[in-house]
Each structure stands twice: as C-alpha cells, then as structure tokens.
A protein has these predicted regions:
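C-terminal cap of thioredoxin/glutaredoxin-like
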Residues: 131-215
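Solvent-exposed, flexible loop/coil residues
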Residues: 28-31, 81, 120, 165, ...
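Long, low-complexity, intrinsically disordered polar/charged segments
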Residues: 1-3, 98-103, 134-139
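Extracytoplasmic thiol/disulfide redox context detector
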Residues: 1-81, 200-215
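Structural alpha/beta surface segment adjacent to cysteine/selenocysteine redox centers
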Residues: 47, 53-125
Length: 215
C-alpha cells in the first residue's frame, strides 16, 4: 500500500464520523444565524495568510457545489497593520465583486509581492483590474466598512477565532484544515485541505438533520 493510498483510506474512515474535540469542536456559545432552512458556513481568513491562500480554490469550489444547501460567507480577520486588506475585502464585498476578485487579491499578495498594506498598494492593485477607482475607494472609505471593523472584532471573540483559516458551520461547529487531520501525523497542506471537505460535508449534514428535527 502506498503512503498516498494509506492517507486516502484514513481520510475516508475519518470522514465517516468526525469526533467533537478532534476534527471539529462545539463553540462554547452558539451564535445566531439568519439563513432560514439553509446552513450557514463562515470562513475567517486573511489575504496575507499562506494557508488561506492554499485553501481558497478548494473551499470556493466546494461551496459552489453545495448549491442551495448552504449560505457561504467570508470574513477577513483583523490584525494590527492589516486594516487595508480588511477594507479591500469589504469594499469588494459591498460592490458584489468578491467572487470576481478574491483570487486576484490573494495572487497580488502571494505572487506579485503587492503586500496590500497601504492605501497606495491597494490603489496599485485596483489599477490593474476593471474596477472603477472612484467607485471602489468610495466603498473602501465608507462608513459601512468602518462599522464592519468593530463588528468583526466582536465576531472574532464570539466565534473564538484564534487562527485562520477557520470554518464555522451553523454558528456553532468549528473546524479547520489542521483540525481535520487531528492525530494523523505529518501530512502535506494539500492533504489537510482535501481532508477538510468530507468533514465539512458531515458537519453540514449534521446541522441539517438537527435543524429538521427541531421543527
């Protein structure tokens, strides 16, 4: 048996029944959701985070395949000195442009060495897109984006966010790529990210079942 096959089999076994406290954990205080019958799935991420960059295409594709089962939301975390990246994401979000430019913003940081740490660097990024600069910076400097600074700070505390990427399912179930391979020894980042998907599938199904039973 090859190492790759052995890992794949272990992932399949793990995905059958993720364990609370290993592949996922319950938040101490569940948070409210507003997604009706659909299951809310939140990703906390940062553009500067290499692990978030590696996960982005995999998680984005997974979310698209869920169709009407879920509502997928992203929140850029807050750290001192990265407010410009936070504002960039939220400006894109307010303009309905996240899906179009999310991977491009990641690429700017990780491939093109534009650190997006200043307004000038963000302007350089915008100049290489089809975004209207005036419209973008109106959103970037808006009161709405400033209000989100405080909101996300509170959310990070409420959702117990200490590292990223972190995924929250149904406002109460936390997982991440590293949690998804708990106890599996040394694995590659690609293997971590691939192992996350069956855990997410299981958590979404669990949340759906429990939501239906509560009616």
């Amino acid at each position: 048996m090859t190492l790759g096959l052995g890992f794949a089999m272990s992932v399949q076994a793990q995905a059958a029944q993720p364990e609370q406290g290993k592949e996922y954990k319950n938040l101490r205080q569940p948070q409210p959701t507003d997604t009706g019958k659909k299951i809310e799935v939140i990703e906390f991420f940062a553009y500067y985070c290499p692990h978030c960059y590696a996960l982005e295409p995999i998680l984005s594709e997974w979310a698209k395949k869920q169709g009407d089962r879920i509502v997928f939301k992203r929140y850029h975390v807050l750290n001192p000195g990265i407010e410009s990246q936070f504002k960039l994401f939220n400006a894109l979000d307010s303009l309905g442009k996240v899906e179009e430019y999310q991977s491009k913003a990641f690429d700017a940081y990780h491939q093109q060495r534009n650190r997006l740490m200043t307004d000038e660097q963000v302007a350089e990024f915008v100049s290489k897109t089809k975004l209207d600069k005036t419209t973008f910076f109106s959103a970037y400097n808006s009161f709405t984006v400033k209000m989100k600074l405080n909101r996300v700070q509170r959310m990070m505390a409420d959702y117990e966010i200490e590292s990223w990427p972190t995924i929250i399912v149904d406002g109460r179930l936390m997982t991440s790529p590293s949690m998804s391979v708990a106890g599996k020894g040394r694995v590659t980042e690609q293997q971590q990210n691939e192992a996350l998907l069956p855990v997410l599938d299981w958590l979404v199904a669990k949340a759906q079942k429990e939501k239906s039973a509560a009616k």
